[in-house]
Amino acid sequence: LIVGIISPEFLSIATSLTQQFDFSELLINVMLPFLLFAGAISVNVHELLNDKWVILLLASFGVIFSTFAVGTAVFWITQQPLFGLSEMGLTYVDCLLFGALIAPTDPIAVLAMVKKMNLSSVTETRIAGESLFNDGIGVVVFLTLLSIKMEGIENITPQSVSLLFINEVVGGVILGAVMGFLGLKLVKYIENEHVELEVIITLSLVLLAPLISHQFHFSAVLAVVVMGLFLNQNIDSDKKAEGLQKAMGDYVYKFWHLLDETLNAILFILIGLEIIPILQNFALGYVFIIIMVIIIVVVSRGIGVFLPITLLSIKKQFEEKTALIITWGGLRGGLSVALALNLPDSIGEGKDLILILTYSVVLFTILVQGLTLKKIVKS
């Protein structure tokens, strides 16, 4: 990003490069399934199942609340004559789409960050699980709103929206469970020494799940996450065998860890390349609006986390500063960028504004929140 600003030649090369491929398509259909699967097989699945209702409530309420809180606030900002954005013609649904794409956190960045902090395993699992599932829920909410945008709100009924939402969520979970169960049974009959076969099987499953999901309009994100939980490194494939054996050999999990790190590095390079051309449409007048939106996003995230934790703390124990860690540790990344790029051109000039706001929030969460979280936790 900095090189692109300093060197106009690099800016030209980056612009040309990003126009040669569809970043949104590459991330959502190729990179994201691999990254989510890698995260799902490494999380502590036993503690995740014990805290499933806590994680699901945090993920679902947080995303839905943030979507409407951020979307409503941004719509109000665009309607104020003071900011001069009313001519862009952003509708309430357009602003809700921004709220939906910026609500889910980046599980890859969150998982990497959580592992570096000395948190209890329960808190670590809650944070990792919430981040994994809010991605799936966020994509479903975004696609539901996108369907309303494309078909026209007058042609949409509450029943059709509910059916679309249920089909995405339930279908994705069932598909992931079926493929995960079959995959577990398959690797169970393969000796863990045959690493190459287990790697090929897992790669095939991750490639196949999104293809089937898109065919039946299921959530590919949820399917891959659920499938990964079935092949988790903490799952015992056969408790009657000598000792407790993992579903797959250690080298398979090491392979996925390496792939996770590699794809994550590539992802952030691609995000940087995508940001550079967008900055050409940046105007100084956006600075105040960006600051306001960042504050709105962080506060909405905080409320969306604090309320469920307050309710759940009646029966569940939470480590001190859990709400603060989940709020400030809610880094945004490639998914938000990909969804923003996937917005229809019918939004008009407002799409450039949404892209700039999205990149600004992503950069703030990574550079400011990501680098200061440890200090905040220790304070």
Where are these regions (language model features)?
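Transmembrane helical cores of multi-pass secondary ion antiporters/exchangers
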Residues: 1-379
